[in-house]
Amino acid sequence: MALRRCLPQYSTTSSYLSKIWGFRMHGTKAAASVVEEHVSGAEREDEEYADVDWDNLGFSLVRTDFMFATKSCRDGNFEQGYLSRYGNIELNPAAGILNYGQGLIEGMKAYRGEDGRVLLFRPELNAMRMKIGAERMCMHSPSVHQFIEGVKQTVLANRRWVPPPGKGSLYLRPLLFGSGASLGVAAASEYTFLVFGSPVQNYFKEGTAALNLYVEEVIPRAYLGGTGGVKAISNYGPVLEVMRRAKSRGFSDVLYLDADTGKNIEEVSAANIFLVKGNTIVTPATSGTILGGITRKSIIEIALDLGYKVEERSVPVEELKEAEEVFCTGTAAGVASVGSITFKNTRTEYKVGDGIVTQQLRSILVGIQTGSIQDTKDWVLQIA
């Protein structure tokens, strides 16, 4: 995955991509010199949709056409980015990501509206969250503009993989990792920013059905002073065994407690959690061990606009018994109703279905994301 010279701007190739792939770049600049190497002689892929069973999408990887990549220069700035065919990448065995876990991920979605527009939801927040994470992990990061441009190029190059309206979304995975070699414990000398996508539908196997969570009492997800508040790749490996055990017992996912006291709920494996009690919506405060989710932030703002009282604070695990509704939020999960939570062999059930607060919040959020509800907050970025 060799990159060209280090330039602050992207190379201009919108006319080439428009001619070959049948889409307009809408101001986004792509890297034709590298793309041409990969697509010359290839069959046209200008049909509106890829050959996918859109009615049976899950949340597993579907190989799309292109990915985007760029690398950092010696001064920490990033080179011009380029699109290449989706495929494997080459890494030095001494790369920082392999030896010392220097890596961050993001999760985003591109939606196709009923009017055919292709939309991104608050991409600048993902870009800023990656920059914050990069500071914590001692990494160089792309600028907000570079981040968004890379995401836009990825979506436009894979436009036929954006599902039809109401059939799902194109999940986007921006990655930032140490690709430079280092034998001793040290920050990498070079970083790679990469974006790929995959069409998806529901994150949980339950689909839109309510989730069944299990409270993990022994193994915490994050520790004070650690990396729980950023989207570091190292946050996810340690919870895989906990998730596997819970799912083998029939649970959808795991709800973790704080490492300090073991008495307060924090978050699910890859989602934030909310409790509904009357007109009050409660969620654990993001105090360094909990990821500040973008869906979480958006739901809080929507709830406040609707007149609900929102409390961000420590939430004792015993308070789960007082909730009328519980729901999870995340880019992958969306807004997912929780039907029950099991703690110390005691199962507490919650309201689910139509007419509940969770459904109201979900409908508004999805409406804004897909363009069916007017975006009065300037949250949505139209890219096609």
UniProtKB/Swiss-Prot annotation:
Statement: the UniProt record of this protein carries the keyword Nucleotide-binding = no
What protein name is recorded for this chain? Branched-chain-amino-acid aminotransferase 1, mitochondrial
Q: Does the keyword DNA-binding apply?
A: no
Question: Could you tell me which InterPro entries the record lists for this protein?
Answer: Aminotrans_IV, Aminotrans_IV_CS, Aminotransferase-like, B_amino_transII, BCAT-like_C, BCAT-like_N, BCAT_family
List the catalysed reactions: L-leucine + 2-oxoglutarate = 4-methyl-2-oxopentanoate + L-glutamate; L-isoleucine + 2-oxoglutarate = (S)-3-methyl-2-oxopentanoate + L-glutamate; L-valine + 2-oxoglutarate = 3-methyl-2-oxobutanoate + L-glutamate
Task: Please list the residues that make up the transit peptide in this record.
Answer: 1-18
One Pfam family from the record: Aminotran_4
What EC numbers are recorded for this enzyme?
2.6.1.42
UniProt cross-references to Gene3D superfamilies, sorted A to Z: 3.30.470.10, D-amino Acid Aminotransferase, subunit A, domain 2 (3.20.10.10)
GO MF annotation list? branched-chain-amino-acid transaminase activity; L-isoleucine-2-oxoglutarate transaminase activity; L-leucine-2-oxoglutarate transaminase activity; L-valine-2-oxoglutarate transaminase activity
Q: Tell me which species this is from.
A: Arabidopsis thaliana (Mouse-ear cress)
What does the entry give for GO biological process?
Answer: L-leucine catabolic process; valine catabolic process
Primary location group: mitochondrion
The GO cellular component terms are: mitochondrion
Q: Where in the cell is it found?
A: Mitochondrion
Kindly list the cofactors needed: pyridoxal 5'-phosphate
Regarding protein family, the annotation reads:
Belongs to the class-IV pyridoxal-phosphate-dependent aminotransferase family.
Write out the pathway annotation from the protein's UniProt entry: Amino-acid degradation; L-leucine degradation; 4-methyl-2-oxopentanoate from L-leucine (aminotransferase route): step 1/1; Amino-acid degradation; L-valine degradation
Briefly state the protein's biological role.
Converts 2-oxo acids to branched-chain amino acids. Acts on leucine, isoleucine and valine.
Going by the UniProt record, its keywords in alphabetical order are:
Aminotransferase, Branched-chain amino acid catabolism, Mitochondrion, Pyridoxal phosphate, Transferase, Transit peptide
Entry-annotated residues carrying N6-(pyridoxal phosphate)lysine: 231
Note the SUPFAM superfamilies from the entry: D-aminoacid aminotransferase-like PLP-dependent enzymes
Query: Remarks, anything else?
Result: Branched-chain amino acids are synthesized in chloroplasts, whereas the degradation takes place in mitochondria.
